[in-house]
């Protein structure tokens, strides 16, 4: 019997705000333990929560970016449980009236090759709700220490429908969702800092069956790669249990990304175990059209939309768009460069950024914002090549020095004597005549309509010119002489 996997993901995203969800104490990471706290965070008697409007703005933006329905009214609920990471013994969350409903995350599955676009599909969402984060437990040899710095930080929970059917789809979903949150300025989504955390609910069922199988929740998925690997492992584990005639038990399992194994933690709790009820200290939130319209004006173009536009507007190939669009700063850098160099030079600009700029940045380990090469540098380099002032090989050398020094291409070319030498027109024409005379086959192919056959003559001409001839003049001269034959 053939089986299919059914996967739903619960993704927690820390919202990037200056202060916490229900108090004005600062939100942050990397501070000394328990220094980002106050009476509200520590749940001291008599304290009352006050909503953070910036966090509400952020979740509305997330909902708009993902095509959710923004509820006109949402409310706050208390999720009751006892654990040391929650001083109140409950978490303020949203239960039956979340702020965002529906929506979808567009994903791209791997193509047949790295330079081939894969299938696109949309993974539907159930909801997005806002809550407060909890503290962090640090387990030592004999003690467990509690750090409440994270407690109270605004946290979005993004819940997908059980519509993911493979580990690769889950990987693509998280990659796309993370990029959306970063593009929107909603979160930095640094998994090492706990800014993006994911739990996976996984079950298997016979192909064609509509009823869901018994689900297992997988936790401790500390990277997007671990999510993919953990899901693949859990699918194999469940299939092995079924093949042995066993029964899948509803439980929570801990995945160890280092060993590629998982172990049972506990039986899965049901929602009613938390005894949700409305928080009496917080009023419902009313989201009117004016509020949504204001947030809509701040929503950026998302990666896949930008990828489609780059192809339509600039005719960029997938090999370039698949790199450029996933970093908003990089795609903005590209468009700023194209604005200076000209839209007709977009592919050339893209090649310099993807192949040369990213290589130098990776080698130097500096962020793009700190790179000395700015859009104007690359635009000037492209114009110098196009004018025949410098040749491509020289431009490669110039780029490396330009990255190291921040000097303009023209200054470097003058300083190092890398400008193309002026070529005597009579001498160039003779070199072209000699190349044409020596290759009758290429002449016949060119005359028969094979335009690329002209390249067979360029090598001998450049060799005769010792690499200093202007490629544009070489091409023009060859075409003129061939047309006259």
UniProtKB/Swiss-Prot annotation:
GO terms for biological process: glutaminyl-tRNAGln biosynthesis via transamidation; translation. InterPro entries: Asn/Gln-tRNA_amidoTrfase_suB/E, Asn/Gln-tRNA_Trfase_suB/E_cat, Asn/Gln_amidotransferase, Asn/Gln_tRNA_amidoTrase-B-like, GatB, GatB_C_1, GatB_Yqey_C_2, Gln-tRNA_amidoTrfase_suB_CS. It catalyses: L-glutamyl-tRNA(Gln) + L-glutamine + ATP + H2O = L-glutaminyl-tRNA(Gln) + L-glutamate + ADP + phosphate + H(+); L-aspartyl-tRNA(Asn) + L-glutamine + ATP + H2O = L-asparaginyl-tRNA(Asn) + L-glutamate + ADP + phosphate + 2 H(+). It is an enzyme of class 6 (ligase). SUPFAM superfamilies: GatB/YqeY motif (SSF89095), Glutamine synthetase/guanido kinase (SSF55931). GO terms for molecular function: asparaginyl-tRNA synthase (glutamine-hydrolyzing) activity; ATP binding; glutaminyl-tRNA synthase (glutamine-hydrolyzing) activity. Its EC number is 6.3.5.-. Keywords: ATP-binding, Ligase, Nucleotide-binding, Protein biosynthesis. Allows the formation of correctly charged Asn-tRNA(Asn) or Gln-tRNA(Gln) through the transamidation of misacylated Asp-tRNA(Asn) or Glu-tRNA(Gln) in organisms which lack either or both of asparaginyl-tRNA or glutaminyl-tRNA synthetases. The reaction takes place in the presence of glutamine and ATP through an activated phospho-Asp-tRNA(Asn) or phospho-Glu-tRNA(Gln). NCBIfam families: gatB (TIGR00133), PRK05477.1-2 (NF004012), PRK05477.1-4 (NF004014). Heterotrimer of A, B and C subunits. Belongs to the GatB/GatE family. GatB subfamily. This is Aspartyl/glutamyl-tRNA(Asn/Gln) amidotransferase subunit B. It comes from Opitutus terrae (strain DSM 11246 / JCM 15787 / PB90-1). The gene is gatB.
């Amino acid at each position: 019997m053939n089986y299919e996997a059914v996967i739903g993901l619960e993704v927690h995203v820390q919202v990037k705000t200056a202060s916490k969800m229900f108090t004005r104490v600062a939100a942050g990471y990397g501070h000394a333990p328990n220094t980002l706290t106050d009476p509200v965070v520590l749940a001291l008697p008599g304290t009352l929560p006050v909503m953070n409007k910036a966090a509400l703005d952020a979740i509305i933006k997330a909902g708009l970016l993902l095509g959710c329905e923004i509820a006109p009214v949402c409310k706050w609920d208390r999720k009751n449980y006892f654990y040391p990471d929650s001083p109140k013994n409950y978490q303020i969350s949203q239960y039956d009236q979340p702020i965002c409903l529906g929506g979808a995350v567009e994903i791209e599955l791997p193509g047949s090759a790295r330079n081939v676009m894969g299938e696109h599909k949309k993974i539907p969402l159930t909801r997005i709700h806002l809550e407060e984060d909890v503290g962090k437990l640090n387990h030592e040899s004999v003690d467990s220490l509690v750090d409440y710095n994270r407690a109270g930080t605004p946290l979005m929970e993004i819940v997908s429908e059980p519509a993911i059917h493979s580990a690769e789809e889950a990987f693509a979903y998280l990659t796309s969702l993370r990029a959306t949150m970063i593009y929107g300025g909603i979160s930095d989504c640094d998994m090492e800092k706990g800014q993006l955390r994911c739990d996976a609910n996984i079950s298997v069922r016979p192909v064609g069956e509509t009823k869901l199988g018994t689900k297992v929740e997988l936790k401790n998925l500390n990277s997007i790669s671990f999510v993919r690997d953990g899901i693949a492992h859990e699918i194999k584990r469940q299939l092995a249990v079924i093949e042995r005639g066993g029964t899948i038990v509803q439980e929570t399992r801990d995945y160890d990304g280092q060993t590629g194994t998982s172990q049972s933690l506990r039986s899965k709790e049901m929602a009613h175990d938390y005894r949700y009820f409305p928080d009496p200290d917080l009023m419902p939130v009313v989201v009117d059209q004016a509020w949504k319209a204001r947030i809509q004006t701040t929503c950026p173009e998302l990666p896949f939309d930008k990828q489609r536009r780059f192809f339509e507007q600039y005719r960029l190939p997938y090999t370039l768009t698949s790199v450029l669009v996933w970093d908003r700063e990089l795609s903005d850098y590209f468009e700023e460069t194209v604005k200076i160099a000209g839209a007709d030079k977009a592919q050339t600009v893209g090649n310099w950024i993807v192949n040369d700029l990213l290589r130098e940045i990776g080698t130097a380990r500096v962020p793009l914002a700190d790179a000395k090469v700015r859009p104007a540098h690359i635009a000037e380099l492209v114009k110098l090549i196009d004018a025949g002032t410098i040749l491509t090989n020289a431009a490669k050398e110039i780029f490396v020095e330009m990255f190291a020094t921040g000097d303009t291409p023209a200054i470097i070319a003058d300083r190092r004597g890398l400008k193309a030498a002026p070529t005597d027109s009579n001498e160039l024409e003779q070199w072209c005549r000699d190349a044409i005379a020596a290759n009758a086959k290429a002449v016949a192919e060119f005359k028969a309509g094979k335009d690329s056959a002209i390249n067979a003559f360029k090598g001998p001409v450049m060799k005769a010119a010792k690499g200093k001839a202007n490629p544009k003049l070489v091409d023009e001269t060859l075409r003129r002489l061939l047309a006259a034959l």
